[in-house]
A protein has these predicted regions:
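Single conserved hydrophobic/aromatic residue that forms the stacking wall/gate
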Residues: 1-13, 18
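Fe(II)/2-oxoglutarate oxygenase catalytic core
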Residues: 14-176, 184-209
């Protein structure tokens, strides 16, 4: 029989509730960003070091050590700024992950944990346009699954494109996407043609036994 696609995407729960939750996350970010600018932090947020650190966190130091990919996006780690909001995201996430793991017997016996919750803002012209995978360096070999939740859809472009699956996932508000972290799911974020794209993303790591 045909196996289910290793890329799971869909809504978990009622659409109205999901949209409210997504709006809450975006609102928190916008408030945080406004405060940061007011505190004269804008230069630090957009510094070369901030971009280099962000690229390293996404791709691994050894894969793109120079940080010369011309990124145009900004991220914050929600778990360090708003624990209650992160807990709500994780609660939403868990239902989708349970469904995903139920489709693949090997994952049922694999101890997984997720702690990072990265909020990412991608403006017009932005995106991560280099094909990559999420377990591309020695330091990230424990990554087992990748997850991402699209927080809005009022922009053009910005699909997540998987090269070997020949699939583009169209962003829709509240959609959770889960996929394996290995090279079989090499992907990129397509150019945001207009508007601003917001997502939260992270990884499930295999716990040592």
């Amino acid at each position: 029989p045909t196996r289910p696609s290793p890329i799971l995407s869909g809504l978990v729960g009622s659409e109205m509730c999901i949209r409210d939750r997504c709006n809450d996350v975006i609102s928190f970010y916008n408030e945080w960003k406004e405060q940061a600018v007011q505190q004269h932090m804008e230069k630090d947020l957009r510094s070369r070091q901030a971009f280099d650190n962000y690229e390293a966190s996404m791709t691994g130091d050894s894969q793109f050590a120079t940080g010369e990919l011309g990124r145009k996006d900004l991220s914050i780690m929600l778990e360090t700024l708003n624990s209650p909001l992160t807990a709500r995201i994780n609660q939403y996430l868990q239902s989708g992950v349970n469904d995903y793991c139920s489709q693949y017997n090997a994952l049922k016996t694999t101890p997984l944990t997720s702690w990072a919750c990265k909020f990412q803002e991608t403006p017009e012209g932005g995106g991560y346009h280099v094909y990559h995978y999420e377990r591309g360096s020695w330091s990230e070999t424990a990554r087992e699954l990748v997850w991402m939740i699209y927080l809005n859809e009022d922009f053009e472009g910005g699909e997540t494109e998987f090269v070997y699956q020949k699939r583009r996932v169209q962003p829709t508000t509240g959609t959770l996407v889960i996929w394996p972290a290995g090279f079989t799911h090499t992907h990129k974020g397509n150019l945001v043609l207009s508007g601003t794209k917001y997502v939260v993303t992270g990884w499930y790591y295999q716990q040592p036994i």
